[in-house]
């Protein structure tokens, strides 16, 4: 932790990098300077970021092995990305998490398929019942009097006194 705030230590690392870069620049045949400079920059950044982070993590965490493993895997993945690789290093924990997630998703989809299958079977059964009712019902003896509302219609002979009750009677009004 004391090296985190030590300005002289940081300046000495920067001076070491600058002197290394100047020695590389003195060689006129050096065509890969930008690549070497970027690698040195990445290494310096990793050095400054990972060592204090690992020290703090080891002091505060209970399981130091997992922290070290995670930090090393992260550093290697960063280097692989900088090198242009799309693959990454994964730990067993990450693989197990991904497998659990895949298994959970498969279970959820199987439950959904089961529900949909049950619903489809119920719908097919309902359609079969409707079809059976439509085919069993006889159509030659349907009482249409209910449909046209003529159940209580009387003929002229059936009316009392032979008089149509719906004919208007004469009404006289005084003016």
From Swiss-Prot:
Question: Mind telling me what this protein is named?
Answer: Non-structural glycoprotein 4
Could you tell me what this protein does? Answer: Plays an essential role in the virus replication cycle by acting as a viroporin. Creates a pore in the host endoplasmic reticulum and as a consequence releases Ca(2+) in the cytoplasm of infected cell. In turn, high levels of cytoplasmic calcium trigger membrane trafficking and transport of viral ER-associated proteins to viroplasms, sites of viral genome replication and immature particle assembly. The secreted form acts as an enterotoxin that causes phospholipase C-dependent elevation of the intracellular calcium concentration in host intestinal mucosa cells. Increased concentration of intracellular calcium disrupts the cytoskeleton and the tight junctions, raising the paracellular permeability. Potentiates chloride ion secretion through a calcium ion-dependent signaling pathway, inducing age-dependent diarrhea.
Q: Which residues are glycosylated?
A: 8, 18
Its GO biological process annotations read:
monoatomic ion transmembrane transport; symbiont-mediated activation of host autophagy; viral process
What do we know about how this protein assembles, alone or with others?
Homotetramer. Interacts with the immature particle in the viroplasm. Interacts with host CAV1, early and late in infection. Interacts with host integrin ITGA1/ITGB1 heterodimer. Interacts with host integrin ITGA2/ITGB1 heterodimer. Interaction with microtubules blocks trafficking to the Golgi apparatus.
Domain topic, free-text comment: Binds 1 calcium ion per tetramer.
> Predominant location of this chain?
host cell
Binding of Ca(2+) occurs at 120, 123
| Topology in membrane | Single-pass type III membrane protein
Keywords from UniProt, A to Z, are: Activation of host autophagy by virus, Calcium, Enterotoxin, Glycoprotein, Host endoplasmic reticulum, Host membrane, Host-virus interaction, Ion channel, Ion transport, Membrane, Metal-binding, Secreted, Signal-anchor, Toxin, Transmembrane, Transmembrane helix, Transport, Viral ion channel, Virulence
GO CC, sorted alphabetically, is: extracellular region; host caveola; host cell rough endoplasmic reticulum membrane; membrane
Please list the residue ranges that the record places on the Cytoplasmic side of the membrane: 52-175
Q: Which residues lie on this side of the membrane: Lumenal?
A: 1-28
